[in-house]
């Protein structure tokens, strides 16, 4: 089970000095917490710890204990910390179960990959106040599977994933938010259904259109290059606040990396200006981007068409999401497939799927269900090298 704790914007911390934050105290198994709606929840086993908070299995209060198959988790942070408070704002505005269900019904979707918000509140323990949020439980993240598959997904898998991500982006955009950091490590599989993918990490999501008024295009040198450097949008490189077109541009870069295992500017991620200039150069000539990334003759034309469509969007323009989905659906048709909702997360080998990888993946899913703790991101267990790399290349825009 993997749940991401929000991160503090690295660049901001560098300018102002690190904010003083406190670690969360351990909650006891079986402890009862009451949310703002007066609903009681029971805390289960701890399954991970972020930089300043803890994550536990959770379920509605009953006479029994919280089992290893609990459907929810609870994130806990000291109430004077900021990241969870920021994430809560998104969930309260845009992720209530009834909102998501209404969208699924009116748009005739099988599901929507936005985590559901089940409740939140403050809990006093030993004279200290803690903020908590109840949310869905998830399985493995896509980055781990991508790396296990030799950093490559099949064309069908990439198109299926991207269709579901477009569904997600349309929803959060219509609710006045942009994500700004779409990438494999922020995409988690459903705990019960490995064919469903969810976009997480809204701790620093940006409200681009409060009360229906779009933020104006404004370059801020202090915000230059915010985001995950290899994927972030050209707008973000220029210090402009995230917008809808930026999310779609980021998805385009993700699709290319998932198909090929690399992006043309990954040879020099330490130089953000080089990365920005490379993206600008390739945006002006999408054909050259395709030639660079797909040197073989059989290029995925739908990717080029998608990128060409996205680059024409103005900063405040509302995308035509169905047009973008239609482009990807044409790609599925071109390879003799269709949108069947199946995510076959295995690598292509000689035109076929590696049976060993498929078997291994099914086994991993079953083990994850049994343990409930696999793939939990724990900041305290990351290697020093990983932490240093992320601090150099992964910054987020804070609302």
Per-segment meaning from a language model:
Residues 161-162:
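Activation segment signature within eukaryotic-like protein kinase domains
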Residues 192, 234-296:
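Conserved C-lobe activation region of Hanks-type protein kinase-like domains
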Residues 44-50, 55:
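Protein kinase glycine-rich loop
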Residues 56-100:
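ATP-binding glycine-rich loop module of kinase domains
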Residues 188-226:
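Activation segment/activation loop of eukaryotic-type protein kinase catalytic domains
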Residues 173-191:
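Catalytic-loop of the protein kinase fold
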Residues 2-38, 44-45:
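Juxta-kinase regulatory segment immediately upstream of eukaryotic protein kinase catalytic domains
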Residues 104-156:
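Conserved structural core of kinase catalytic domains
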